[in-house]
Structures are given as C-alpha cells and as structure tokens.
Amino acid sequence: MALTQGPLKFMDVAIEFSQEEWKCLDPAQRTLYRDVMLENYRNLVSLGICLPDLSVTSMLEQKRDPWTLQSEEKIANDPDGRECIKGVNTERSSKLGSNAGNKPCKNQLGFTFQLHLSDLQLFQAERKISGCKHFEKPVSDNSSVSPLEKISSSVKSHLLNKYRNNFDHAPLLPQEQKAHIREKAYKCNEHGQVFRASASLTNQVIHNADNPYKCSECGKVFSCSSKLVIHRRMHTGEKPYKCHECGKLFSSNSNLSQHQRIHTGEKPYKCHECDKVFRSSSKLAQHQRIHTGEKPYKCHECDKVFNQIAHLVRHQKIHTGEKPYSCNKCGKVFSRHSYLAEHQTVHTGEKPYKCEECGKAFSVRSSLITHQLIHTGRKPYKCKECDKVFGRKCFLTSHQRIHTRERPYGCSQCGKIFSQKSDLIRHRKTHTDEKPYKCNKCGTAFREFSDLTAHFLIHSGEKPYECKECGKVFRYKSSLTSHHRIHTGEKPYKCNRCGKVFSRSSNLVCHQKIHTGEKPYKCNQCGKVFNQASYLTRHQIIHTGERPYRCSKCGKAFRGCSGLTAHLAIHTEKKSHECKECGKIFTQKSSLTNHHRIHIGEKPYKCTLCSKVFSHNSDLAQHQRVHS
C-alpha cells in the first residue's frame, strides 16, 4: 500500500562526512561546507518546507563536527514504488506536508517539490567515489577542488533537468548549478521589486500573511524563528556569546565566529578577480562590487547610487538633517557615530592612534594617516595646473580651487562664500560667538580645537618643529614652513594689483588692504582704525598704559615685543644686521631696511594731499603736520 509522502527535511539534502573524511578537508573547504549547509537550511525554512530547528543552525554556526548530525528519517514508498523521505510528524510539518491523498508536498509559494531517496543516493554515491573514504583515496594537497565540488556533471544535470520545471530557484542544488539559475531575475508579487533567487524567496515569505515569526516589541517579521530569537536580543540587550580571547560579547554566534577570525587571522573568503581575502562573506560581496561597478542602493531624494546600504543610510541623513548621536558632555550632536567618537576625544584627551615610526599619537585616525605621509614621503596626487603634489586626494581637490576660484561653501547668515568647508564651519562660529574649547591651564577659550592645541604649546614650552637648515625651532608647523622660505627665497604669494610677492599669505592679505584702503580694525577708545589686528592691539596699549614686555637684565618694560628685542641688543652689543652696500651694521632689521633705501632711492611713503614722497614713515608723519 502506498504511503503518504511527508514533507522534505533538512537531512534529506544534507551532505554528510564521516570523521575520517572530514580530516581530509582543509579549513577553507570546511568553511565552504558549513556555508553551503547553512544556506540550504535557511532556504528550506524560508520556503516553509521544513521546521526551523535551532539545533541544526547552532551546530553549524558553532563549527561542530558534521557527523554529530543525527537524522530521524523513515523510508516509505511513493505510488511509483520508489523510496522517498518521510519526515517527523510535528504540528507545522503536518500542516505543510500532509495533503489530501497521495498528492505531493506543495510549499507556500505554490510550486510542487519532491525529492526522492534514489536521487539523494546519487549524490552520496558520487561523493564516496570521488571522496576519501577511510583514507583509501586521500585528497591531494595540491588539489584546488574540494570534495563538495566533485559531484559529477551527469548527476547534477539529472537533478537540474528533473526539478527545473517544478521550481526555477533551485535553492537545494549544488552551487555550480545555482550560478546558472541565478542569472534569471525574480519579481516580488507584493511590491514589484526584483531579486535574484535566494533574495526573492526570502522576500516573498516576509510578505506572506501566514508568517508566524513576528517581534512583539517592534512588529518586525522574520522568515524563521532563529532570526527572530537573534533579533529579540537587540531589545533585551542579551549577548550570550563570549570571545575567550578578549572577553567581547555578541548577540549571535555567527557574529562571534566572524569576530574570532580577527584573533586567528583567518580570511577564508577570496576574491577571484584580485585574490584579496576577507574574514566574512558579506565583506567579500561588498568588495566584489568594486569590480562589477554595481551600485544597487539608490537615494530617492537625489538619485545618487551607492554600493553599500550603510553608505546610503549615512547619505540620507543629509536630506533629513538627522543627527542622532549626542555628546553626553556638551550636548553637541552628530550625524555619524564615528564623528561623535572623534569629538569625545576632545573631552577625554585620548589619543588612540599612534604612529609606529615615531610614536606620535593622534585623537583622529585621519590625522594619523596625514602624519604618516611625512615618513613615507609618498605624494601620488599631482595638480595638472602647477605640478604641485599631494599625499591625499582631498588635499589636491582643495588646492585645485585656487586655480578654479571655486567657492562652493556659502554662509546662510551673511552670504560669505568659502573654498573650504572647514573655513565655513570656522566662520559660522563668529555669528554665535561660540568658543567650546577651553584651556584648563589659564581658562582661555577658543573656537577651534586646533587653536587650543596650538595654545597648549605656550604653557608646555614645547617647540617640536625644527629647521634642518639652521636648527631654529618653532611651536607651529606653519611657522617653520614660513621660516624655511627665508632659506629657499620662495615667495609664492603675489599681489594681482602691483605684482609684489610675499613669503606668507597673511602678509599678502595685509598688503592688499593698502590698495583697497580697507581698515576693518577700530579702537573702541578713540575710534582710530587699522588695517591689521596686530596694529590695533599694539595701539590699545597706549590707552591701558600696559607694558607687558620686560627686560630681564635691567627691568625696563616695553609696550611691544619688537621694542624689547631692540633694547636687548644694547646689553649684548650684538649688531647682526649688516648692509651689503656699505658694510654698516645695525641692531634692528627695521633700521637696516630704512638705511637700505638710501642706496636704492626708494621712497614708498606718499602724502595724499600734495603727492610728495618720503623714504621713511616718520618723515611722512612729520610732513603731514604742515598741512594740518
């Protein structure tokens, strides 16, 4: 009498290895075996063909040996007299498998699926012939073909042709045949989205109203109970899987397994295009999109496409303005967790990124990468306009705006535009008067963290930047760069009005105010205006009577540093500034500059009322009294 055929089970399609056979496989082949078995089981579950059994996935994820799989199949006969698999009669399997009469099992997606024992035996027979039973036919170490891949083409063709009419997706076929079938696209009946085989199956199950695996906390539905169990741990915070190397905890065993590869150095997933290896299959899949150029994730706001969903999610925060990450110290909010982590080092003073060459530490990884270019000297990015080279592409992009005069960053408050985003961010703080970075030594506050870092050097007395030409040391790298131009004679900053060149950009900016007549710095006491902030600062000392610069030799005090420097020459009798024309020497460089005008006949100071010119500013000031 013909028996009713039960539902297909995971063990029906599982390829088993004995303990002796298992020893013939290398680590990569064992990983491949587990991945294939896990994928097949999950596809069966997603189709509703077998009951989700956590013990099976647990065994595979925990990397237990495959011969621990214990099957409970019973053998029965179908109406044709062939042997077929009869599964355990659980409540759900009965619901899915025990159809009226002798009808074959029909899964949730509506296509007929039968797999007879005789077909499975073909697999087992071929594997034993080509495999290594009891070490009688050991696998060669030089062989690149795993036992899983040695199923003959005749057997594969037999199964493919037989079941192709029943289902196109073929989730249980060998990987080689799945590759052919995957070329065909599959469409979800709910919202029309197109998937490849496994994705379409999973997606269809999610839409199925009969799906029982729903999270009671957030309403999210899952295709199998194991995924729901893992998901629930997000709400409970449970992390039952612990790494014995470092003690780190994980919510799922698969995450632990992936993490442990950091300690072992194992990278079993290899890219066939460039031979690069990866710890996880998901990282390999992401990497392969570099070769294919595939960017499947599209922003519906601006149509920009991305090769990773994480990049799309991050990008969408630009449109929404969402900044979910808040600093618990100062309340500042960020769009990315990485930005928050970098910011928090301001409060902690932590510098986790250390240079292996010189031991210098940095709070931000990007700063370390920039610093390492000093040691390597590598500058692969070249400007086509001026041939200047840069260590990073972003530096080149910023530099090129000098040539294009592009200023894409505009202030919404005053309309001022900038070529660099960092300049705009710095400028915005002038509207708010925000100075979040405070010195814990003297209480001085700064708008920028870099300004605070530079200020710290005043207290420490540290001058880490040394000139290789003369040995002079500086607090700031920019000061060393400017100083170095004394030796090279380089003056890269040129005035477009008169062609005068300068070694510093700040000197050019000050000079250009002569042409524009701009004097933006005004004294609150007397209303006098100046074209440089330093001139205003020096002037304000007249009102306060302050003389902060004191001579350590005689105690005489001065308003400005230059006055003290000139005075110190009296004590040392040092006259280091010599005129090359006549040999006369001076204690101050400014005195030499004034003297040098006698030889060249330069008279740069002009009276605006009568156009008379003078070689010294003091002579002009004295002359202007005639008009007043």
Curated annotation (Swiss-Prot):
The keyword Ion transport does not apply. Residues 8-79 form the KRAB domain. Keywords: DNA-binding, Metal-binding, Nucleus, Repeat, Transcription, Transcription regulation, Zinc, Zinc-finger. It comes from the Eukaryota. A zinc finger (C2H2-type) spans 213-235, 241-263, 269-291, 297-319, 325-347, 353-375, 381-403, 409-431, 437-459, 465-487, 493-515, 521-543, 549-571, 577-599, 605-627. One of its GO terms (molecular function) is zinc ion binding. Belongs to the krueppel C2H2-type zinc-finger protein family. May be involved in transcriptional regulation. This is Zinc finger protein 528.
